[in-house]
Curated annotation (Swiss-Prot):
Residues 53-90, 131-168 form the LDL-receptor class A domain. Disulfide bonds join C54-C67, C61-C80, C74-C89, C132-C145, C139-C158, C152-C167. GO terms for molecular function: calcium ion binding; cargo receptor activity; cobalamin binding; growth factor activity. Residues 1-35 form the signal peptide. GO terms for biological process: B cell costimulation; cobalamin transport; positive regulation of B cell proliferation; regulation of vitamin metabolic process. It comes from Homo sapiens (Human). This is CD320 antigen. It is found in: Cell membrane. Glycans are attached at N126, N195, N213. Residues 210-223 have a biased composition (Polar residues).
Length: 282
């Protein structure tokens, strides 16, 4: 009887413990749901990021809502993924004052590259060129200004070398910035130049024999002294003779079957013995 009652008490305890665990689990799930409520999509979120969320110094991309610096707007570089920062950019040709709006205040580059719509600055038609300072010269095909003293100095200073064109003549540059004046050409200057180029030292009879004597004496010195070519030729002939004799000796020894392993040494010893015997004989 007591055993059955103890079994029932154990079962009740197990059931109560399981119920308590279930209650704790349900309470934890409820607290988690209260901490992070489910968000429902609204009409504003479905339409995209709200406009005006970026500060006044920023530009908001239309699709991503990213805020980029306002200076990146209409700078011909896609900073937004949808390219909205380069849309509705008003670009007009350069005006006579050398301005390309927008943005105002930026000078027309006048670099020969079509930076504005219509290519008006490509041929420098609507671009104003800055004037050179006093005492300076503008290059013909560029906006570079160089000092007038660099004109016709023998060194090209302009990219197109226009500062060295027309030197020595009364030629006016295409830009009209400077005129180069050369020295006046007179009859006396032409006559003096011709005399300087054609007239040489006077030719006399004394100068002609002296040249001939010098030539003959140098030739006699060369013929009287032995040259090194004969010595070199003799040495070459002697070397060739020695090589030929050596080759003939080796061929003869090979024909006599004496040029075998240690055969050459034996032959040399025999030749030495023969020479000693010949010298010992009276």
């Amino acid at each position: 009887m007591s055993g059955g009652w103890m079994a029932q008490v154990g079962a009740w305890r197990t059931g109560a413990l399981g119920l308590a665990l279930l209650l704790l689990l349900g309470l934890g799930l409820g607290l988690e749901a209260a901490a992070s409520p489910l968000s429902t999509p609204t009409s504003a979120q479905a339409a995209g990021p709200s406009s005006g969320s970026c500060p006044p110094t920023k530009f908001q991309c239309r699709t991503s809502g990213l805020c980029v610096p306002l200076t990146w707007r209409c700078d011909r570089d896609l900073d937004c993924s949808d390219g909205s920062d380069e849309e509705e950019c008003r670009i007009e040709p350069c005006t006579q004052k050398g301005q390309c709006p927008p943005p105002p205040g930026l000078p027309c580059p006048c670099t020969g590259v079509s930076d504005c719509s219509g290519g008006t600055d490509k041929k420098l038609r609507n671009c104003s060129r800055l004037a050179c300072l006093a005492g300076e010269l503008r290059c013909t095909l560029s906006d570079d200004c160089i000092p007038l003293t660099w004109r016709c100095d023998g060194h090209p200073d302009c990219p197109d070398s226009s500062d060295e064109l027309g030197c020595g003549t009364n030629e006016i540059l295409p830009e009209g910035d400077a005129t180069t004046m050369g020295p006046p050409v007179t009859l006396e200057s032409v006559t003096s130049l011709r005399n300087a180029t054609t007239m040489g030292p006077p030719v006399t009879l004394e100068s002609v024999p002296s040249v001939g004597n010098a030539t003959s004496s140098s030739a006699g010195d060369q013929s009287g002294s032995p040259t090194a070519y004969g010595v070199i030729a003799a040495a070459a002939v002697l070397s060739a003779s020695l090589v030929t004799a050596t080759l003939l000796l080796l061929s003869w020894l090979r024909a006599q079957e004496r040029l075998r392993p240690l055969g050459l040494l034996v032959a040399m010893k025999e030749s030495l013995l023969l020479s000693e015997q010949k010298t010992s004989l009276p």
